A protein has these predicted regions:
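Single conserved hydrophobic/aromatic residue that forms the stacking wall/gate
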Residues: 1-11
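C-terminal charged capping/lid subdomain of soluble metabolic enzymes
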Residues: 302-369
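Active-site segments that bind and position negatively charged phosphate/pyrophosphate groups
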Residues: 201-312
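ATP/NTP phosphate-donor binding region
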Residues: 12-98, 322
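Short glycine/serine/threonine-rich phosphate/pyrophosphate-binding segments
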Residues: 29, 52-56, 107-114, 134-137, ...
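A short, small-residue-rich loop immediately preceding and capping a beta-strand
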Residues: 92-115, 119-130
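A glycine/threonine-rich phosphate-anchoring loop and its flanking beta-alpha core
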Residues: 20, 118-211
């Protein structure tokens, strides 16, 4: 695997590939043959069961008309694990397919990335059905154990060949996914800036750092309205903008930045919170990252940013306290021990310690929100 703790193509030769996408309503799937024709005429489709039920009625007629043969439709299994990726990759229908479709949210799409790596970078296309992460346009896969503990980050050597974004499907999804997706996306701006601080920048990282502001400012201005519109299933300009911000803008930034520059304290704290089984089960990744961003602000002494964001946190309901994620202060040692053990904190302008994180979490508990 081209994982963060092993040598990969990124170590030997920096290659930066930006994602491509089509955006629209159900009509977006009409573009499928245009982008798949270079790769063959057989596909294995892998995704979440709910996601497949939402997307396949719109995808299948296009595939039939184009003469693209579906060799198999496979539920991904509910968690992105190396074991499940290997299991799917060993299926004859998947090995025989010319290319893969990844349908669903981040865990389903990341599972297909693991499958693609197993099959020597088999081409894959993404069809996100929730706007909760940039998984559909990025090279990174967040991999977990079967019991839902964070296991590591794996990289494919390129982003998906193409991403088909159907906003008509996305607006029908529960609003909590966009809500969490925006929380995850805001952190991209601040985490890349912090990771890259005091380091010599090349063109790609400069581009990524400039673009990263588009991961935060549009959400500050339009995020609450988009969330409200999503709650009533109204596809508005604000909703479409947030979909593109979460799925695509963040993917571009990820593609520009070296892997270790893409996350730091916010994600590390998220993984610490997720060590609690009930928290991981009942709270979304982006929700916990949003909380972790507040801890980043405190640790990094960005109190002006903390105060700038707290009002929208209150309005939109992102967590500001441990209790909102089913935790209390007795769990702080577990959170911070996990946080400092992950690769996310390795590239930092200064050493991140357990004491530093614990103090910031306790300080956040004292703030009236």
């Amino acid at each position: 695997y081209t994982a963060l703790n092993t040598l990969s193509l990124h170590d030997a030769l920096p290659i930066y590939c930006l994602p491509s996408y089509s955006f629209g309503g159900h009509d977006v799937f009409g573009a499928i043959p245009q982008f798949t024709k270079l790769y063959g005429h057989t596909v294995a489709i892998i995704g979440g069961e709910t996601a497949l039920s939402k997307a396949m009625p719109h995808i299948q007629p296009v595939l039939d008309k184009a003469g693209i043969n579906v060799l198999d439709v496979i539920p991904f299994g509910g968690e992105c694990t190396f074991a499940r990726g290997k299991e799917i990759a060993a299926m004859d229908s998947v090995k025989d397919a010319d290319f893969l479709f990844a349908v669903g949210g981040g865990k389903a799409i990341d599972t297909v990335k693991v499958v693609a790596v197993e099959l020597d970078d088999k081409p894959f296309f993404t069809i996100p059905t929730i706007a909760s992460t940039c998984a559909a346009t990025s090279e990174a896969a967040a991999v977990y154990t079967a019991d839902h503990n964070f296991d590591g980050i794996a990289f494919v050597n390129h982003p998906p060949v193409h991403c088909f974004i159907d906003a008509d499907i996305l607006v029908e999804a529960p609003s909590r996914y966009l809500w969490a997706g925006m929380g995850d996306t805001i952190a991209k701006h601040y985490e890349t800036l912090m990771s890259a601080r005091n380091r010599e920048q090349v063109y790609n990282t400069q581009l990524g750092l400039v673009l990263s502001s588009m991961c935060s400012e549009p959400i500050l201005e339009h995020g609450l309205q988009a969330y409200k519109d999503n709650e009533i299933k109204h596809r508005s300009e604000a909703f479409d903008l947030m979909v593109m911000t979460v799925i695509f803008t963040t993917g571009i930034v990820s593609g520009c930045m070296p892997g270790d520059y893409n996350s730091i304290i916010a994600h590390a704290v998220c993984y610490g919170c997720a060590t609690n089984e009930e928290t991981e089960k009942h709270h979304l990744h982006g929700e916990m990252v949003a909380y972790g961003l507040l801890i980043l602000f405190i640790v990094d002494k960005q109190l002006d940013e903390l105060n700038r964001w707290l009002p929208i946190y209150r309005e939109i309901g992102w967590p500001t306290k441990l209790s909102q994620m089913g935790l209390d202060e007795s769990y702080i040692p577990q959170i911070v021990e996990k946080a400092v053990s992950v690769r996310d904190v390795v590239v930092s302008p200064y050493e991140i310690t357990t004491d530093m994180l614990a103090e910031a979490i306790r300080y956040m508990e004292t703030i009236e929100c």
